[in-house]
Swiss-Prot record:
The active site is at 9 (tele-phosphohistidine intermediate), 82 (proton donor/acceptor). This is Probable phosphoglycerate mutase GpmB. The keyword Isomerase applies. Pfam families: His_Phos_1 (PF00300). Belongs to the phosphoglycerate mutase family. GpmB subfamily.
């Protein structure tokens, strides 16, 4: 059975400021660095063999801290990037016009083909993050990979494994540096393929962490 761990990046400056990041970037805060060190300690205990990360700066930094603890190299995969939020990237949520807020809410409330202008649809996001996960099946037998990605991206991935459409209402809370686990297995009692073992574990963190809807 292949076990794949999923980690959201540490808290960033724009998370704390409630600004929309998408594929734009801001650095980890001091708290985010601490969260990454705490998840790194947990990852070392899990026997991680490979670290595969989104190539955006906030995930790169989180992955670097984890890799140092685990003694692993990092593979960067752009398919693990966050949802492209188009014209709303870098904007403070509280500054959005009514029309702009409606664009953003489409992605939260489950609108088929919802899309921010110049951004991605949830289906496009789902296609690429699921392809990145599927690539883990090509790793050597006995591998235990850890993927470092983003809140909406990982939420979409876990939700689609559970059988929900990519655009379904967002009802999964994945806080900064939370750990989820998905397994690929053949089972008599569960559907064969990917199954969700855990989602959003923050027991390794010593302080409250932000979820995507609190940014």
């Amino acid at each position: 059975m292949l076990q794949v761990y999923l980690v959201r990046h540490g808290e960033t400056q724009w998370n704390a400021e409630r600004r929309i990041q998408g594929q734009s970037d801001s650095p980890l805060t001091a708290k985010g660095e601490q969260q990454a060190m705490q998840v790194a300690t947990r990852a070392k205990e899990l026997g991680i063999t490979h670290i595969i990360s989104s190539d955006l700066g906030r995930t790169r930094r989180t992955a670097e801290i984890i890799a140092q603890a685990c003694g692993c190299d990092i593979i960067f995969d752009s398919r693990l990037r966050e949802l492209n939020m188009g014209v709303l990237e870098t904007r403070n949520i509280d500054s959005l016009t009514e029309e702009e807020e409606n664009w953003r809410r489409q992605l939260v409330n489950g609108t088929v083909d919802g899309r921010i202008p110049e951004g991605e649809s949830m289906q496009e996001l789902s296609d690429r993050v699921n392809a990145a996960l599927e690539s883990c099946r090509d790793l050597p037998q006995g591998s235990r990979p850890l993927l470092v990605s983003h809140g909406i991206a990982l939420g979409c991935l876990v939700s689609t494994i559970l059988g929900l459409p990519a655009w379904a209402e967002r009802r999964l809370r994945l806080r900064n540096c939370s750990i989820s686990r998905v397994d690929y297995q053949e089972s008599l009692w569960l559907a064969s393929g990917w199954v969700v073992e855990t989602a959003g574990d923050i027991s390794h963190l010593d302080a409250p962490a932000l979820d995507e809807l609190q940014r």
